Amino acid sequence: MSKAKFERKKPHLNVGTIGHVDHGKTTLTAAISAVLTKAHGGEVKDFASIDNAPEERERGITINTSHIEYDTDTRHYAHVDCPGHADYVKNMITGAAQMDAGILVVAATDGPMPQTREHILLSRQVGVPHLIVFMNKCDMVDDEELLELVEMEVRELLSEYDFPGDDLPVIQGSALKALEGDPVWEAKVMELADALDTYIPLPERDIDKPFILPIEDVFSIAGRGTVVTGRVERGIIKVGQEVEIIGLRPTVKTTCTGVEMFRKLLDEGRAGENVGILLRGTKRDDVERGQVLAKPGSIKPHTKFEGEVYILSKDEGGRHTPFFKGYRPQFFFRTTDITGAVELPEGVEMVMPGDNLKFVVDLIGPVAMDEGLRFAIREGGRTVGAGVVSKIIE
Protein backbone atom coordinates (compact mmCIF):
# COMPACT_ATOMS: atom_id res chain seq x y z
CA MET A 1 0.00 0.00 0.00
CA SER A 2 1.53 3.30 -1.04
CA LYS A 3 -0.31 5.35 1.60
CA ALA A 4 1.83 4.26 4.56
CA LYS A 5 4.94 5.13 2.60
CA PHE A 6 3.69 8.63 1.94
CA GLU A 7 2.87 9.16 5.65
CA ARG A 8 6.48 8.65 6.64
CA LYS A 9 7.53 11.62 4.55
CA LYS A 10 5.70 13.98 6.90
CA PRO A 11 7.90 16.00 9.22
CA HIS A 12 8.07 14.49 12.70
CA LEU A 13 7.68 16.30 16.04
CA ASN A 14 7.86 15.18 19.65
CA VAL A 15 5.27 16.60 22.02
CA GLY A 16 3.95 15.80 25.48
CA THR A 17 1.20 16.69 27.91
CA ILE A 18 2.27 18.46 31.10
CA GLY A 19 0.36 20.02 33.99
CA HIS A 20 -1.09 19.50 37.47
CA VAL A 21 -2.29 16.12 38.72
CA ASP A 22 -5.92 15.33 37.78
CA HIS A 23 -6.25 18.24 35.38
CA GLY A 24 -6.86 15.77 32.55
CA LYS A 25 -3.51 15.17 30.81
CA THR A 26 -4.15 11.48 30.18
CA THR A 27 -7.79 12.03 29.20
CA LEU A 28 -6.64 14.66 26.71
CA THR A 29 -3.99 12.29 25.35
CA ALA A 30 -6.69 9.64 24.81
CA ALA A 31 -9.00 12.24 23.23
CA ILE A 32 -6.31 13.39 20.79
CA SER A 33 -5.67 9.76 19.87
CA ALA A 34 -9.38 9.09 19.31
CA VAL A 35 -10.18 12.26 17.36
CA LEU A 36 -7.11 12.33 15.11
CA THR A 37 -7.20 8.61 14.42
CA LYS A 38 -10.79 9.02 13.29
CA ALA A 39 -9.65 11.75 10.91
CA HIS A 40 -6.33 10.34 9.70
CA GLY A 41 -6.25 6.61 10.44
CA GLY A 42 -3.83 4.78 12.70
CA GLU A 43 -4.15 2.91 15.96
CA VAL A 44 -6.38 4.29 18.72
CA LYS A 45 -4.98 4.10 22.25
CA ASP A 46 -7.72 4.20 24.88
CA PHE A 47 -7.52 5.86 28.29
CA ALA A 48 -6.80 2.63 30.17
CA SER A 49 -3.83 1.65 28.02
CA ILE A 50 -2.33 5.16 28.25
CA ASP A 51 -2.98 5.39 31.98
CA ASN A 52 -1.30 2.04 32.55
CA ALA A 53 2.07 3.45 31.53
CA PRO A 54 4.89 0.95 31.09
CA GLU A 55 8.04 1.31 33.15
CA GLU A 56 11.20 2.33 31.33
CA ARG A 57 14.76 2.80 32.45
CA GLU A 58 16.78 5.75 31.24
CA ARG A 59 20.34 5.94 32.63
CA GLY A 60 19.29 3.65 35.46
CA ILE A 61 16.33 5.82 36.43
CA THR A 62 12.89 4.24 36.52
CA ILE A 63 10.31 6.28 34.61
CA ASN A 64 6.71 5.45 33.73
CA THR A 65 5.78 6.88 30.35
CA SER A 66 3.10 6.28 27.74
CA HIS A 67 3.85 6.90 24.08
CA ILE A 68 1.23 7.46 21.41
CA GLU A 69 1.50 8.52 17.78
CA TYR A 70 -0.87 10.48 15.59
CA ASP A 71 -1.02 12.34 12.29
CA THR A 72 -2.40 15.69 11.26
CA ASP A 73 -2.72 16.86 7.64
CA THR A 74 0.87 18.05 7.54
CA ARG A 75 2.78 16.32 10.34
CA HIS A 76 3.42 13.17 12.33
CA TYR A 77 3.56 13.48 16.12
CA ALA A 78 5.01 11.29 18.84
CA HIS A 79 3.36 12.19 22.14
CA VAL A 80 4.40 11.28 25.69
CA ASP A 81 2.21 11.27 28.78
CA CYS A 82 3.34 10.43 32.32
CA PRO A 83 1.17 9.19 35.17
CA GLY A 84 2.94 10.89 38.06
CA HIS A 85 4.64 14.18 38.81
CA ALA A 86 7.96 12.47 39.62
CA ASP A 87 7.88 10.79 36.19
CA TYR A 88 7.67 14.21 34.52
CA VAL A 89 10.58 15.53 36.53
CA LYS A 90 12.76 12.53 35.61
CA ASN A 91 11.63 12.49 31.99
CA MET A 92 12.36 16.13 31.39
CA ILE A 93 15.69 16.17 33.20
CA THR A 94 17.12 13.01 31.59
CA GLY A 95 15.80 14.04 28.18
CA ALA A 96 14.27 10.56 27.88
CA ALA A 97 11.37 12.31 26.19
CA GLN A 98 12.86 15.20 24.24
CA MET A 99 9.96 17.57 23.64
CA ASP A 100 9.79 19.98 20.71
CA ALA A 101 6.68 21.38 22.40
CA GLY A 102 4.60 20.82 25.50
CA ILE A 103 0.81 20.86 25.77
CA LEU A 104 0.08 22.44 29.14
CA VAL A 105 -3.22 21.13 30.49
CA VAL A 106 -4.99 23.38 33.00
CA ALA A 107 -8.42 22.55 34.42
CA ALA A 108 -10.75 25.53 34.07
CA THR A 109 -12.40 24.39 37.32
CA ASP A 110 -9.13 24.86 39.27
CA GLY A 111 -6.97 27.29 37.36
CA PRO A 112 -3.17 27.11 37.66
CA MET A 113 -2.00 24.92 40.58
CA PRO A 114 1.46 24.27 42.14
CA GLN A 115 2.49 21.61 39.60
CA THR A 116 1.29 23.83 36.76
CA ARG A 117 3.92 26.32 37.84
CA GLU A 118 6.51 23.62 38.46
CA HIS A 119 6.06 22.09 34.99
CA ILE A 120 6.33 25.50 33.33
CA LEU A 121 9.55 26.16 35.26
CA LEU A 122 10.92 22.71 34.36
CA SER A 123 10.09 23.31 30.70
CA ARG A 124 12.02 26.56 30.85
CA GLN A 125 14.97 24.97 32.70
CA VAL A 126 15.37 21.94 30.43
CA GLY A 127 14.82 23.91 27.24
CA VAL A 128 11.37 22.87 25.97
CA PRO A 129 11.15 25.56 23.29
CA HIS A 130 7.37 26.01 22.99
CA LEU A 131 4.22 25.51 25.04
CA ILE A 132 0.58 25.68 24.05
CA VAL A 133 -2.31 25.54 26.49
CA PHE A 134 -5.36 23.32 26.61
CA MET A 135 -7.84 24.61 29.17
CA ASN A 136 -9.70 21.46 30.12
CA LYS A 137 -13.09 20.78 31.78
CA CYS A 138 -14.60 23.93 30.23
CA ASP A 139 -17.91 22.05 29.98
CA MET A 140 -18.11 22.29 33.79
CA VAL A 141 -17.76 26.08 33.94
CA ASP A 142 -20.83 28.07 32.89
CA ASP A 143 -19.41 31.49 33.64
CA GLU A 144 -17.70 32.99 30.59
CA GLU A 145 -15.91 35.55 32.77
CA LEU A 146 -14.43 32.82 34.93
CA LEU A 147 -12.98 31.13 31.84
CA GLU A 148 -11.45 34.44 30.76
CA LEU A 149 -9.99 34.90 34.23
CA VAL A 150 -8.37 31.46 34.24
CA GLU A 151 -6.95 32.03 30.76
CA MET A 152 -5.51 35.36 31.89
CA GLU A 153 -3.93 33.73 34.95
CA VAL A 154 -2.31 31.00 32.85
CA ARG A 155 -0.97 33.52 30.34
CA GLU A 156 0.53 35.64 33.14
CA LEU A 157 2.15 32.59 34.72
CA LEU A 158 3.73 31.62 31.38
CA SER A 159 5.05 35.15 30.86
CA GLU A 160 6.58 35.03 34.34
CA TYR A 161 8.82 32.19 33.11
CA ASP A 162 9.72 33.90 29.81
CA PHE A 163 7.27 32.06 27.58
CA PRO A 164 5.27 34.37 25.26
CA GLY A 165 2.15 34.26 27.45
CA ASP A 166 0.29 36.90 25.45
CA ASP A 167 0.82 35.24 22.09
CA LEU A 168 0.70 31.49 22.54
CA PRO A 169 -2.48 29.58 21.66
CA VAL A 170 -4.93 28.74 24.46
CA ILE A 171 -7.68 26.30 23.47
CA GLN A 172 -10.73 25.98 25.69
CA GLY A 173 -12.14 22.47 25.57
CA SER A 174 -13.25 19.32 27.32
CA ALA A 175 -11.12 16.21 26.88
CA LEU A 176 -13.74 13.93 28.43
CA LYS A 177 -16.58 15.20 26.21
CA ALA A 178 -14.35 14.90 23.13
CA LEU A 179 -13.45 11.35 24.15
CA GLU A 180 -17.17 10.57 24.48
CA GLY A 181 -17.60 11.71 20.88
CA ASP A 182 -19.41 15.04 21.36
CA PRO A 183 -18.77 16.87 18.04
CA VAL A 184 -18.65 20.35 19.65
CA TRP A 185 -15.78 19.29 21.90
CA GLU A 186 -14.14 17.06 19.27
CA ALA A 187 -13.77 20.23 17.21
CA LYS A 188 -11.74 21.73 20.07
CA VAL A 189 -9.28 18.83 19.89
CA MET A 190 -8.95 19.46 16.15
CA GLU A 191 -8.33 23.11 17.01
CA LEU A 192 -5.53 21.99 19.36
CA ALA A 193 -4.00 19.84 16.59
CA ASP A 194 -4.23 22.81 14.26
CA ALA A 195 -2.48 25.00 16.85
CA LEU A 196 0.33 22.43 17.07
CA ASP A 197 0.67 22.47 13.28
CA THR A 198 0.69 26.23 12.89
CA TYR A 199 2.24 27.59 16.09
CA ILE A 200 5.05 25.09 16.69
CA PRO A 201 7.86 25.52 14.14
CA LEU A 202 9.64 22.45 12.82
CA PRO A 203 12.73 21.82 14.92
CA GLU A 204 16.08 22.20 13.25
CA ARG A 205 17.27 18.74 12.26
CA ASP A 206 20.43 17.44 13.94
CA ILE A 207 22.12 17.25 10.56
CA ASP A 208 21.60 20.99 9.96
CA LYS A 209 23.21 22.05 13.25
CA PRO A 210 26.92 22.87 13.63
CA PHE A 211 29.16 19.79 13.61
CA ILE A 212 30.13 18.17 16.90
CA LEU A 213 31.60 14.74 17.68
CA PRO A 214 32.33 13.57 21.25
CA ILE A 215 35.65 11.70 21.15
CA GLU A 216 35.44 8.12 22.39
CA ASP A 217 38.82 6.77 21.38
CA VAL A 218 42.13 7.89 19.90
CA PHE A 219 44.43 5.79 17.70
CA SER A 220 47.74 6.39 16.05
CA ILE A 221 48.05 4.96 12.54
CA ALA A 222 51.62 4.61 11.27
CA GLY A 223 52.28 6.82 8.27
CA ARG A 224 48.84 8.44 8.43
CA GLY A 225 48.59 10.21 11.75
CA THR A 226 46.04 10.34 14.53
CA VAL A 227 42.48 9.07 14.23
CA VAL A 228 39.70 9.88 16.69
CA THR A 229 36.51 7.85 16.77
CA GLY A 230 33.00 8.56 17.98
CA ARG A 231 29.42 9.12 16.95
CA VAL A 232 28.64 12.38 15.20
CA GLU A 233 26.19 14.10 17.57
CA ARG A 234 25.05 16.69 15.05
CA GLY A 235 26.01 18.30 11.78
CA ILE A 236 28.27 17.04 8.99
CA ILE A 237 32.05 16.79 8.81
CA LYS A 238 33.65 16.91 5.36
CA VAL A 239 37.22 16.03 4.43
CA GLY A 240 39.30 19.22 4.34
CA GLN A 241 37.25 21.11 6.92
CA GLU A 242 38.83 22.82 9.92
CA VAL A 243 37.75 21.59 13.35
CA GLU A 244 38.50 22.54 16.94
CA ILE A 245 39.42 20.05 19.67
CA ILE A 246 37.64 21.35 22.77
CA GLY A 247 37.53 20.57 26.48
CA LEU A 248 39.85 19.35 29.27
CA ARG A 249 42.80 21.35 27.90
CA PRO A 250 43.33 24.49 25.80
CA THR A 251 41.38 24.51 22.52
CA VAL A 252 43.39 23.48 19.43
CA LYS A 253 42.50 23.94 15.77
CA THR A 254 43.26 21.23 13.20
CA THR A 255 42.00 19.90 9.86
CA CYS A 256 40.05 16.75 9.06
CA THR A 257 42.05 14.91 6.39
CA GLY A 258 39.95 11.76 6.24
CA VAL A 259 36.64 10.23 7.35
CA GLU A 260 36.15 6.49 7.55
CA MET A 261 33.34 4.18 8.52
CA PHE A 262 33.67 0.37 8.70
CA ARG A 263 37.15 0.72 7.19
CA LYS A 264 35.77 2.50 4.13
CA LEU A 265 36.88 6.02 3.24
CA LEU A 266 34.10 8.58 2.94
CA ASP A 267 33.83 12.21 1.84
CA GLU A 268 31.83 13.13 4.94
CA GLY A 269 30.42 11.90 8.24
CA ARG A 270 26.85 12.79 9.23
CA ALA A 271 24.82 13.10 12.43
CA GLY A 272 24.15 9.66 13.91
CA GLU A 273 27.07 7.90 12.21
CA ASN A 274 29.97 6.22 14.00
CA VAL A 275 33.10 7.39 12.26
CA GLY A 276 36.86 7.65 12.52
CA ILE A 277 38.34 11.05 11.72
CA LEU A 278 41.93 11.54 10.65
CA LEU A 279 43.44 14.76 12.01
CA ARG A 280 46.30 16.59 10.30
CA GLY A 281 49.45 17.16 12.33
CA THR A 282 47.85 16.11 15.59
CA LYS A 283 49.85 13.87 17.91
CA ARG A 284 48.36 10.91 19.72
CA ASP A 285 48.97 12.64 23.06
CA ASP A 286 47.29 15.90 22.01
CA VAL A 287 43.79 14.41 22.13
CA GLU A 288 41.86 12.33 24.64
CA ARG A 289 38.50 10.74 25.27
CA GLY A 290 36.05 13.28 26.68
CA GLN A 291 37.07 16.11 24.38
CA VAL A 292 34.89 17.00 21.40
CA LEU A 293 35.63 17.83 17.79
CA ALA A 294 33.51 20.76 16.69
CA LYS A 295 33.02 23.35 13.99
CA PRO A 296 35.31 26.26 14.94
CA GLY A 297 33.57 28.87 17.09
CA SER A 298 30.35 26.86 17.49
CA ILE A 299 30.80 25.70 21.10
CA LYS A 300 32.95 26.86 24.01
CA PRO A 301 34.49 25.08 26.99
CA HIS A 302 33.08 26.00 30.42
CA THR A 303 33.76 25.05 34.03
CA LYS A 304 30.87 26.60 35.94
CA PHE A 305 27.18 26.13 35.29
CA GLU A 306 23.78 25.86 36.90
CA GLY A 307 22.08 22.50 36.54
CA GLU A 308 18.54 21.24 37.05
CA VAL A 309 19.08 17.89 38.73
CA TYR A 310 17.25 14.76 39.84
CA ILE A 311 18.97 12.68 42.54
CA LEU A 312 18.19 8.96 42.30
CA SER A 313 16.26 7.34 45.11
CA LYS A 314 17.66 4.39 47.05
CA ASP A 315 15.27 2.05 45.17
CA GLU A 316 16.71 3.22 41.85
CA GLY A 317 20.18 2.24 43.00
CA GLY A 318 21.10 5.75 44.10
CA ARG A 319 22.59 6.95 47.36
CA HIS A 320 21.18 5.69 50.64
CA THR A 321 22.09 8.89 52.47
CA PRO A 322 21.72 12.62 51.83
CA PHE A 323 24.63 14.78 50.70
CA PHE A 324 25.63 18.20 52.02
CA LYS A 325 27.55 21.25 50.88
CA GLY A 326 31.06 20.42 49.72
CA TYR A 327 29.77 17.34 47.81
CA ARG A 328 32.25 16.48 45.01
CA PRO A 329 31.00 13.72 42.71
CA GLN A 330 31.93 13.12 39.07
CA PHE A 331 29.87 14.65 36.29
CA PHE A 332 29.60 12.46 33.20
CA PHE A 333 29.34 14.58 30.03
CA ARG A 334 29.00 12.71 26.73
CA THR A 335 31.97 10.34 27.03
CA THR A 336 33.82 11.17 30.24
CA ASP A 337 33.65 11.80 33.98
CA ILE A 338 35.02 15.02 35.44
CA THR A 339 34.99 15.97 39.12
CA GLY A 340 33.00 19.00 40.19
CA ALA A 341 32.12 20.79 43.42
CA VAL A 342 28.45 21.36 44.15
CA GLU A 343 27.19 24.70 45.52
CA LEU A 344 23.77 24.21 47.09
CA PRO A 345 21.20 27.01 46.77
CA GLU A 346 20.50 29.45 49.61
CA GLY A 347 18.59 27.79 52.43
CA VAL A 348 19.25 24.20 51.29
CA GLU A 349 21.32 22.33 53.87
CA MET A 350 21.10 18.81 52.50
CA VAL A 351 19.81 16.89 49.50
CA MET A 352 17.93 13.62 49.92
CA PRO A 353 17.84 10.69 47.49
CA GLY A 354 14.76 11.22 45.26
CA ASP A 355 15.01 15.04 45.40
CA ASN A 356 14.85 17.38 42.42
CA LEU A 357 16.63 20.72 42.68
CA LYS A 358 18.80 23.25 40.94
CA PHE A 359 22.41 23.81 41.96
CA VAL A 360 25.67 25.31 40.71
CA VAL A 361 28.59 23.08 39.71
CA ASP A 362 32.23 24.10 39.49
CA LEU A 363 34.20 21.56 37.41
CA ILE A 364 37.94 20.99 37.89
CA GLY A 365 38.46 21.20 34.12
CA PRO A 366 36.65 22.73 31.14
CA VAL A 367 34.00 20.82 29.18
CA ALA A 368 32.46 21.83 25.84
CA MET A 369 28.88 22.66 26.71
CA ASP A 370 25.72 24.48 25.69
CA GLU A 371 22.59 25.05 27.68
CA GLY A 372 20.44 21.93 27.37
CA LEU A 373 23.36 19.47 27.59
CA ARG A 374 22.48 16.38 29.64
CA PHE A 375 24.81 14.82 32.20
CA ALA A 376 24.89 12.06 34.79
CA ILE A 377 26.17 12.44 38.34
CA ARG A 378 28.34 9.50 39.36
CA GLU A 379 30.29 8.21 42.32
CA GLY A 380 32.97 5.74 41.33
CA GLY A 381 31.17 4.76 38.13
CA ARG A 382 27.76 4.37 39.78
CA THR A 383 25.05 6.77 38.62
CA VAL A 384 23.49 8.68 41.51
CA GLY A 385 21.78 11.49 39.62
CA ALA A 386 20.87 13.03 36.29
CA GLY A 387 20.86 16.63 35.21
CA VAL A 388 20.70 19.18 32.45
CA VAL A 389 22.71 22.39 32.06
CA SER A 390 20.15 25.15 32.55
CA LYS A 391 22.52 28.12 32.58
CA ILE A 392 26.20 28.62 31.82
CA ILE A 393 28.03 30.79 34.35
CA GLU A 394 31.66 30.78 33.17
Curated annotation (Swiss-Prot):
This is Elongation factor Tu. The keyword Protein biosynthesis applies. It comes from Psychromonas ingrahamii (strain DSM 17664 / CCUG 51855 / 37). Residues 10-204 form the tr-type G domain. Monomer. Residues 19-26 are annotated as: G1. Residues 136-139 are annotated as: G4. One of its GO terms (cellular component) is cytosol.
